[in-house]
Amino acid sequence: GTGKTITSLNCLLEIYKRNGYYKAIILVPTITLVNQWEQECHKFNFMNVIKVYSKNPLWKEDVESIHFNEEYRLKNERETSYVIISTYASYTREKVFNTLNGFSKKQLLLIADECHNMASGSMLKRLAYIPYLRRIGLSATPDRQYDDEGNRNLRKFFGAENHYTYEYSMEEAIRKGVLCKYLYYPHIVRLTTEELEAYVELSERIAKYFNDDTCSVAKMDEGLKMLLLARKRIVHKAA
């Protein structure tokens, strides 16, 4: 990779150097990534890590303990430091969402790994209610195909409309030796007659959602999503 994880944790480290504490919520799409991020946090010596996912039934007690310490901290006591790592699936649940959004909106850093996941479904509906002002979104593929509305909301949430987004292209990464050079070897796979007919029929139905003036889809609804997935399956199953 190009170092997205390390870059974001260095931002958290900088907050620690300036203020003497670290406070972060890290959102990830899978349980595997929860564990990977925990390992990376430990490398930065962020040791107070709480994992919020189905395999950790004690997470709520740990989070409530942090809430208690922050609420009743004496002026001469040090700030509580912590990193909370949650899957998107857990975070969007009502009780979890309310519990994890009760921290200081000015102190806590929100890191969203594979942040394009935030632009759809229940996560998209939650964006407006996430209070934290420090936000970092990480993604190698931030723009969602055929989802202009989701892309707009995501850019607005992370301040990309105000040019606060840093882009590091694959071309630049290869040129600087961060990524290895590689060669493409296309393997042509042709659709059967039945597959092609189904593909064309789905494409015609999808085209009805397309705005010729803007060359885009105004809004991604469930009907369009199902059509796109059905067409995608035809390509993926082609032999």
Residue ranges and their predicted role:
Residues 120-181:
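Post-DEXD/H (motif II) to motif III coupling segment of the RecA-like Helicase ATP-binding lobe
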Residues 51, 143-145, 194:
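Short, acidic Gly/Pro/Ser/Thr-rich loop/turn segments
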Residues 11, 165-239:
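Interdomain linker/hinge connecting the two RecA-like lobes of the SF2 helicase core
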